[in-house]
Curated annotation (Swiss-Prot):
NCBIfam families: PRK04940.1. Belongs to the UPF0227 family. This is UPF0227 protein Sbal_2415. The lineage of its organism: Bacteria, Pseudomonadati, Pseudomonadota, Gammaproteobacteria, Alteromonadales. Pfam families: UPF0227.
């Protein structure tokens, strides 16, 4: 089972396409949608929804996959549920870069402060990151340097921020899920 978490643009048609591509790894791909506008509510909703979905699966190794803001959540919700995560062009600092886009971006800082201290150290090797070299939204070199001590980093020379084509990375994602 793969949980797919969309980015800030929840209605993008690319979400369906990415889910279809992920079905080459596992036919059971589930969209876990969230508002993107209310971080504290989103966290509660995502924790509840993932726990509910996991009760109805016998997959020994479910995987979280998120793009952009979805990768922010995939890392945290995956950690809290003991799941591996794939973080694609993750938005690591929504409290800074979501100003003016959502009602309460400061809630992300509050979530970070209340999260398990040093959670990345406790989550080492349980996530892999895929970064676009040409991401038009974030400085992925900086973000990769924040995560490289904890997770493997793969680079893509072609895809933009929304990462519409996962095909080149599906074998690595599958191997990571099954390892």
């Amino acid at each position: 089972m793969i949980f797919y978490l969309h980015g800030f643009d929840a209605t993008s048609p690319g979400n369906h396409e990415k889910m279809r591509q992920l079905q080459f790894i596992d036919p059971d791909v589930r969209l876990v949608s969230y508002s993107t506008l209310h971080p504290k509510h989103d966290m509660q909703h995502l924790l509840k929804e993932v726990a509910k979905q996991m009760k109805h699966s016998d997959d020994p190794a479910p995987l979280m996959v998120g793009v952009g803001l979805g990768a922010y959540w995939a890392e945290r919700i995956g950690f809290l549920n003991g799941l591996k995560s794939v973080l694609i062009n993750p938005n690591l600092h929504p409290e800074e870069n979501m100003q003016g886009k959502i009602d309460r971006p400061e809630e992300y800082a509050d979530i970070a402060n209340k999260c398990v201290s040093q959670f990345r150290e406790k989550n080492t090797h349980k996530a892999m990151c895929i970064f676009s070299v040409n991401d038009e939204m974030f400085d992925n070199q900086q973000l990769a340097s924040e995560l490289s001590a904890y997770y493997s980093i793969d680079w893509d020379d072609v895809q933009p921020h929304k990462f519409p084509q996962l095909a080149a990375h599906l074998p690595k994602i599958k191997a990571f899920k099954l390892a």
